[in-house]
Structure formats: structure tokens, C-alpha cells
From Swiss-Prot:
Family membership noted in the UniProt record: Belongs to the triosephosphate isomerase family.
Residues annotated as binding substrate: 9-11, 173, 212, 233-234
Protein's pathway: Carbohydrate biosynthesis; gluconeogenesis; Carbohydrate degradation; glycolysis; D-glyceraldehyde 3-phosphate from glycerone phosphate: step 1/1
Lineage: Bacteria, Pseudomonadati, Pseudomonadota, Gammaproteobacteria, Pseudomonadales
UniProt keyword list: Cytoplasm, Gluconeogenesis, Glycolysis, Isomerase
The protein's name: Triosephosphate isomerase
EC numbers, comma separated: 5.3.1.1
Any one GO biological process: glyceraldehyde-3-phosphate biosynthetic process
Organism: Pseudomonas putida (strain GB-1)
């Protein structure tokens, strides 16, 4: 039985004051015990959030990490080693904004994935298609290629210690959302691709949906058999809204 997971990606939002307010709101939530809850604050606020959530069942992760596991001469980056020391347990790899805006390639993301696992960080691999790719009927081709990049480099068992988030690029921050059935179809294809390599890994890996998830649509999305929770963007910046999404996952 896969444990539901709800992860909040705060992206490049927050000041010291607003992060303190959000963290306090999260610490006061009554969260369902069966749901794995995580937040990914900007790197500058990771320590503040970890301190503010001390004693709470909320995991803190990083939005990005370096291509090498250890600290060293790599200006502007944060090493997995450093994130682990700070208290992080998870790291986002390949979010569409990193792929589309920063230009990170599958090769770069493979290195980040491996570096994170080498230091005990669990990667949350983000995959998904653009609107143009969906309209061209290439959704499964694109998602399959992004998944295959990791499988070919490290083997499918790399996903025994990873999470996968399907996030259609056209549904991120646009207000557009894949229908529950559209999302389920892609999630089923992802799980099927993994199962062709290793049925046990496929059955256990958590598959999250990301793309304008909010309290109003979370329950219907999370009710799909291959959707194990969500990677939440804007709605995670409101503690009450995020709490409602977590409760939807618990149901």
C-alpha cells in the first residue's frame, strides 16, 4: 500500500516575515496521520522552516541541488551534502521551470539525481509535457523519454528510493488542470513503463500530480488509482488551503 504524499513547492516566494507566518500556520494544522507531508522552501529559508516545524510531522526538502554530491568549487550551487546537514530529506529534480527556464537537460538532471541519492537525499523527479507536445499527441512519448533517461543511466531500481511527480507544463500556474482521467492516464503509463522493468518497484513508487492542484479539485484527482498525492505550487503558500489538500489525500 502506497502512502499518500502532499508536497508544497514554495518556489521563489517568501520573505523572512512571510515564511515565519506560513511556517506557524503549518505547525498549527491538524494533519492526517496517514499522509506524508513535505514542503520545499527557497534555500535561504530552509533552516528557518526546519526550526519552525521542529517536532511536527512535516518533512523539509530543497528545490534544487548541485550536480556533485560534496561541497566544493561550484559557485552559486548547494551540494546534497550541505542540504543533508541542514536537515533536508528530499530534493526536487527536473521541475519544469528548471527544464524550461534554466535549460537543464536530462544529462544534467541525471547527475543531480545521482548526486542526491549518493548523500541520502530522496529525489522527487519531475516530468511532464508542454502544451504544444500535448496537442501534438506526444505526451506519453515525452514523459516516457524523461523517465527512460534515469532508467537507462541507473536502472529502474533507482526509483526504489525516489518519488515521481507528473506535472504537465501547460497546467502549472495557469489555472488549467488536467482532468482526473487525463492525469490518471499518464500516471498509469508511467507506472506501466516502470512495471515493464520491475513490477515491485512500480507498485511501490509514489506518483504525484502537479499542476494547479487546489482544495477544490484535490479529492477527485487523488481518488484516481495511480495518483498517490500532489506536488502543490501556489496553493501551498496558504496554510489552510494546503491543510485542506492534505486532508483530501488522507481520505
Amino acid at each position: 500500500m502506497r502512502r499518500p504524499m502532499v508536497a508544497g513547492n514554495w518556489k521563489m516566494h517568501g520573505t523572512r516575515a512571510s515564511v515565519a507566518e506560513l511556517t506557524e500556520g503549518l505547525s498549527n494544522l491538524a494533519l492526517p496521520s496517514g499522509v506524508e507531508v513535505a514542503v520545499f522552501p527557497p534555500a535561504l529559508f530552509i533552516n528557518q522552516v526546519i526550526d519552525g516545524l521542529a517536532g511536527k510531522e512535516i518533512t523539509v526538502g530543497a528545490q534544487n541541488s548541485a550536480v556533485q554530491p560534496e561541497q566544493g568549487a561550484l559557485t552559486g550551487e548547494v551540494a546534497p551534502e550541505q542540504l543533508v546537514e541542514a536537515g533536508c530529506k528530499l530534493v526536487l529534480i527536473g521541475h519544469s521551470e528548471r527544464r524550461q527556464v534554466i535549460g537543464e537537460t536530462d544529462e544534467v538532471l541525471n547527475r543531480k539525481f545521482a548526486a542526491a541519492q549518493a548523500k541520502g537525499l530522496k529525489p522527487v523527479l519531475c516530468i511532464g509535457e508542454t502544451l504544444e507536445e500535448r496537442e501534438a499527441g506526444k505526451t506519453l512519448e515525452v514523459v516516457g523519454r524523461q523517465l527512460s533517461s534515469i532508467i537507462e543511466a541507473f536502472g529502474v531500481k533507482a526509483f526504489a528510493n525516489a518519488v515521481i511527480a507528473y506535472e504537465p507544463v501547460w497546467a502549472i500556474g495557469t489555472g488549467l488542470t488536467a482532468t482526473p482521467q487525463q492525469a490518471q492516464d499518464v500516471h498509469a503509463a508511467i507506472r506501466g513503463q516502470l512495471a515493464a522493468e520491475d513490477a515491485e518497484v512500480a507498485a511501490k513508487v509514489q506518483l504525484l500530480y502537479g499542476g494547479s492542484v487546489k482544495a477544490a479539485n484535490a479529492a477527485e484527482l487523488f481518488g484516481m488509482p495511480d495518483i498517490d498525492g500532489g506536488l502543490i505550487g501556489g496553493a501551498s503558500l496558504n496554510a489552510d488551503e494546503f491543510g485542506a489538500i492534505c486532508r483530501a489525500a488522507g481520505n
